[in-house]
Amino acid sequence: MRLQRQCIVVNMRSAIVLIMIFVLTGIRNSETASGGNQMDLSDSKGDHKDNSNASNGNGNANDNEVYVPPLVSSMVAKSGGGAGGLLDNITAYSSSSSSSSSNGNNNMLCPYDKETPCDRLQFPCIRCNYNHGCIYGRDLNVTCEVINNVQCLGERSFQRQMNCRYCYQTEMWQQSCGQRSSCNSATDKLFRTNCTVHHDVLCLGNRSFTRNLRCNWTQGYRWSTALLISLTLGGFGADRFYLGHWQEGIGKLFSFGGLGVWTIIDVLLISMHYLGPADGSLYI
């Protein structure tokens, strides 16, 4: 008994509709990616300008100073200012933000709760006397003291252990860095971003700094999907449209895949990860 093979027959109208869908999708994805990248570039330029102005105006800042958010500064201005009012508003702002956080008491900053042990407080609620002459990489004990107008339980001066190193030398899991989606991940480039160490980390120098990170972001393109489309519909330029290279996709469509040569080349390029999304993102 012979087995009959079932074939799927696609007429010319269905093929044209399918190709037009890939063309419109590729154009839309490329325009969306380019528009998002321009917005990210403008935002990064604005952030860089704000950071440069802040650094020029606060050249004498050290790691023991408490950062005052703009909202708190406006609250202080409305209340009449003063050192005592400033610290009161700092604690009020910190307690309100900690109440809305779901991470519990570990992330509280300057709480009003008198039952909180003083030795559990973190930056910026404490100030520590750092020994800048310590040996790099060695663990040492430093004396920390709770800042004024912060209520806590126990001794306001206590010992805490730290590792002798500057803040920019801490591990990556001890830092929070801003990510950028305006860089090209395919070329394996580096980009400069702002990083800040976590509140529970004690270190020397400025707690906020800039560093170079490797560009690594995705936009939802799958390598397996791109390879499958290239193997099946590569002759119509569907793989190029899927990845956002719609200009090359149109040329590939009207040349019937470069008479088969272009199709084979694209299959090899996609399989070896040489051909990626047009927006510079990585495959997922």
Swiss-Prot record:
GO terms for biological process: ectodermal cell fate determination; lateral inhibition; mesoderm development; neuroblast fate determination; Notch signaling pathway; positive regulation of Notch signaling pathway. Residues 42-51 have a biased composition (Basic and acidic residues). Keywords: Developmental protein, Glycoprotein, Membrane, Notch signaling pathway, Signal, Transmembrane, Transmembrane helix. Residues 220-267 form the TM2 domain. The chain crosses the membrane at residues 226-246, 250-270. Residues 33-225, 271-284 are extracellular. It is a multi-pass membrane protein. Residues 247-249 are cytoplasmic. Residues 52-63 have a biased composition (Low complexity). Coiled coil: none annotated. Disruption phenotype: Viable but females are sterile. Reduced adult lifespan. Adults display climbing defects progressing in severity over time due to age-dependent decline in neuronal function. No morphological defects of the eye, wing, notum or leg. Eggs produced by mutant mothers fail to hatch and embryos display neural hyperplasia. Some lines of mutant flies show reduced eye size and nicked wing margins, however these phenotypes are probably due to disruption of neighboring genes. Residues 33-63 are annotated as: Disordered. The keyword Signal applies. Residues 1-32 form the signal peptide. Belongs to the TM2 family. The name 'almondex' was given due to the slight almond-shaped eye phenotype of some mutant fly lines (the '-ex' denoting the gene is located on the X chromosome). Positive regulator of Notch signaling during lateral inhibition and boundary formation. Interacts with Notch signaling at the membrane, at the level of gamma-secretase-mediated S3 cleavage. May regulate Notch signaling by regulating the subcellular localization of N/Notch in a context dependent manner. Maternal neurogenic factor involved in Notch signaling-dependent mesectodermal and neuroectodermal specification during early embryogenesis. Functions cooperatively with bisc/TM2D1 and amrt/TM2D2. Required for maintenance of neuronal function. This is TM2 domain-containing protein almondex. It comes from Drosophila melanogaster (Fruit fly). The lineage of its organism: Eukaryota, Metazoa, Ecdysozoa, Arthropoda, Hexapoda.
